[in-house]
Structure formats: C-alpha cells, structure tokens
C-alpha cells in the first residue's frame, strides 16, 4: 500500500464577525499555490475538507456551512497607500470548486488583526495604545477597505465588551469602512446594473417579482418577503428544511444573475454560488431570534433574510449588510421602502440572530447614485494558530 506523507503549512484559524476561516500568508503557501490556479484551489479544498458528499467536511477545517467554509490569503500590499492585499476564497462544501467572485465582509474584520500580528503592517504605524488604521486592498473586488483595530500595549486587543448578534461572547469592536463599495468593474458595471432602482424579474414557472439589483459590497438581489409568501421573520430551519423553497430561491437567483449581467446563461449559476446573494425584506415585525432573544418591531427599521451558498444565513453576511445599508440610503429601492422610505444615512435591520446597524452615505451626482462609504462594526479573534496538514499529493 502506497503512503504519501503529509505536509504542514503555517495557518491561523480565526473568527471574523459571524464567520470563521483559515488564514494564510501568501509566502507561507507551497510555491505552486502562491499563484492563482488549479494547485491553489485543490490545496484549499483539501484544507477545508471538500468536496464532501456527506456535506459535513469531517476531514478538513470547514464547518459545513457557508459561514465556516472559507479561506483567506494575505500579503504585504503591492498597492500604493495600502498595508495588506486580501484575497478571499469561498470553498464549496459538496463540489470541487473555490469561488473567488466576491469578498467576505465578516472575515474582513479579522484581516486587520492578522495583518498587524503577522508583520504585514509597518511597525511604526502601530500605536502602543489606541486604534491602528489598517488599509486593506480587497483583491477579489478591487476595492479599499479600512479597518480600525484596537491596540493595547502594542498588541491587537481581541477581548472586550462589544456584543454582536450571532456571536456568543463579547469581544473588542473593530469598525470597518468600505470605501466606494459600488461595483465599477468589468462584471456588472454600475451600482444598479440595469439602470433602475426597482425592476421586474420574470422567472419561468415561478413568477414575476419586483426586485432591486445592486452591486455594493457584494452583488445582491433584493425581493419583497410578501411576494414570496414569507413574513420576513423566518429563521434558518423554516427555509433550510424546505428543499422546494431552496430550489426556488436558487432558480430566482440564477435568473437574477443573468439580468444583472453577472452570467450569460442560468446554467453558469451553479459554478458561481458566492455571488450574487439573494435576500428578502419586509417592514418591522415582532419576532424571536434564534438565540431566544425577543426583537421588537420598534428595535429595527426593517427585517432582512439572506441566503448564502444556497442556504438561509444564520445571521447576515457582512458584504450583504453593506448592500443593505447602501440600498437603504437610496430612496425608492425595495430596502429603502421596507424601512419606511425617505433619505437616511444608517439603518438597523433584524436578521435571524438579532439586529445589526450599518451606515452608508449616498448622493445623487449627474443622475447617478454614488455611495462614498459604508460603515459597520464587527469583532474578530484568533481561535487557533500553528500549522494545517494536508496529504502531499493533494495539489
């Protein structure tokens, strides 16, 4: 029987926001995996434990959910006036691919902490006490993100009293600024790729829906909960235990992706699970969060439920929160209308685990909506650091 020895790679397992992922420094990866391509993807798949037909990722670091099947590669930035280049890979659980089409807003909260602790931020920029401003170049979406990381006695402060719904224990607050979050790249173009703040989306054998398509933080399709037969108060099990509902959402997402210009044919959606996201909104209602916490309609401006990688998210994706804040700031979008309409610079929304506040500054310039930045607070913590091992013939 042949035997292939395992290799070990320096890695850090971190929580960022309501997600967890395996973090690497680019130059710690095996040489073949230091460049984009098949070797890198195969390595990350093996690290996380995919593809797994059992859907459990038992033989890897993944947690068998969209929030925990994630990888991050960081390097000293090659961009002027930036500290760190941040590349995010969303690893499919049951299929053999890594989706590089978008960012993870939750893990963004951990990028600054990792960069400081691993020598990617110049030492003269790190205060003895206070906030360290880490300038992040997000390579997937070619955008600048600023993380304000608390420092105590020259070290990253991870513990604190900041509470984040969806995370059990309090931690230190990390404020994140997503600068110019609207997509202006080759895929999707403007913030509103169709040129409209509300469109009609026709989905064969499903129905016709009002939709807001937006490229901000991450490409997102917003629908009205009532049009789908929902209240907006649903928790994970209500949606994720309904295979018919999940298939319907995926079909709507595929047709929406075509209308947004992200793919040319609905058949391409299966290999692009990370983007676009699909979410549904409703006016405030009383509900009980997954933790048992009561959320009153007076606590929030609107309710939002979002799907990631084919399942309802347990809380809210960080990038989708940017999309929510941006859409809420622009009068007439479905998100804005669910929040009561009008102009606003911040919104607090209810999600399955509780509530979240996100701010965005929008203005109309030459008949085009422009958002200068979106702001939200998360937290981050190192869970484990050392080496991750994979069979030497994995890639």
Q: Which positions does each model-derived feature cover?
A:
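A glycine-rich beta-to-alpha transition motif near the start of alpha/beta enzyme domains, typified by
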Residues: 1-395
């Amino acid at each position: 029987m042949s035997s292939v020895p395992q290799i070990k790679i320096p890695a850090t397992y971190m929580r960022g926001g309501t997600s967890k992922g395996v973090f690497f420094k680019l130059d710690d990866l095996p040489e073949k995996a230091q460049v984009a391509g098949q070797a890198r993807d195969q390595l990350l798949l093996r690290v996380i434990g995919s593809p797994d037909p059992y859907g459990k990722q038992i033989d890897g670091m993944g947690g068998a959910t969209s929030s925990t099947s994630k990888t991050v590669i960081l390097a000293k930035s090659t961009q002027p006036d930036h500290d760190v280049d941040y590349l995010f890979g969303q690893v499919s659980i049951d299929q053999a691919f890594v989706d590089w089409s978008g960012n993870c807003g939750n893990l963004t909260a951990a990028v600054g902490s990792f960069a400081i602790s691993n020598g990617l931020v110049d030492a003269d920029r790190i205060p003895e006490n206070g906030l360290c401003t880490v300038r992040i170049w997000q390579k997937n979406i070619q955008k600048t993100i600023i993380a304000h990381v608390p420092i105590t006695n020259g070290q990253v402060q991870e513990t604190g009293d900041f509470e984040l719904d969806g995370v059990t224990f309090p931690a230190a607050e990390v404020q994140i600024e997503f600068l110019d979050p609207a997509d202006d790249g080759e895929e999707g173009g403007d913030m509103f790729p169709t040129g409209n703040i509300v469109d009609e989306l026709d989905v064969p054998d499903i129905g016709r829906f009002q939709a807001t398509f937006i490229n901000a933080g991450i490409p997102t399709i917003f629908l009205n909960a009532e049009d789908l037969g929902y209240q907006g108060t649903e928790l994970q099990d209500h949606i994720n235990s309904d295979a018919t509902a999940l298939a319907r959402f995926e079909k709507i997402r595929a047709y929406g992706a075509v209308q947004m210009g992200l793919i040319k044919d609905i058949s391409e959606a299966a290999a692009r699970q990370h983007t676009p996201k699909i979410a549904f909104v409703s006016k405030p209602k009383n509900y009980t969060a997954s933790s048992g916490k009561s959320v009153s309609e007076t606590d929030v401006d609107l309710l939002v439920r979002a799907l990631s990688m084919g399942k309802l998210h347990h809380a809210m994706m960080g990038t989708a929160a940017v999309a929510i804040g941006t859409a809420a700031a622009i009068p007439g979008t479905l998100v804005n209308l669910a929040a009561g309409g009008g102009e606003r610079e911040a919104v607090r929304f209810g999600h399955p685990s509780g509530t979240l506040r996100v701010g965005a500054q929008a203005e109309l310039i030459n008949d085009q909506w422009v958002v200068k930045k979106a702001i939200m607070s998360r937290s981050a913590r190192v869970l484990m650091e050392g080496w991750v091992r994979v069979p030497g013939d994995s890639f």
